[in-house]
Amino acid sequence: MSEFVRALAFSELSPGQCVEVSVAGKPVALYNVAGAIYATSNTCLHRGGPLGQGALDGPVVLCPWHAWSWDVTTGENTANPELKIPTYPVKVEDGQVLVQIG
């Protein structure tokens, strides 16, 4: 099992915000949904848009390129739940957001 890796300080991600980070060399999007942190692949399955640059509305992120939307808590596409982006385990320790990749 892989280790949890520091992604950023919890204070850098305000509620309702999403951000792009690199974790263990992989592009990851982090989301603060009402104080809970979620992590997904940063790549939209439609055309590869950067989800961390999208708009977060509750638990749903809207891809900035073509408006595909994803539930960040499950990775499911809101129009077709059979389509899923990878999600990653997250924990917050000592004010740091840690993500487990692969």
What kind of region is each of these model predictions?
Residues 3-10:
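Short amphipathic
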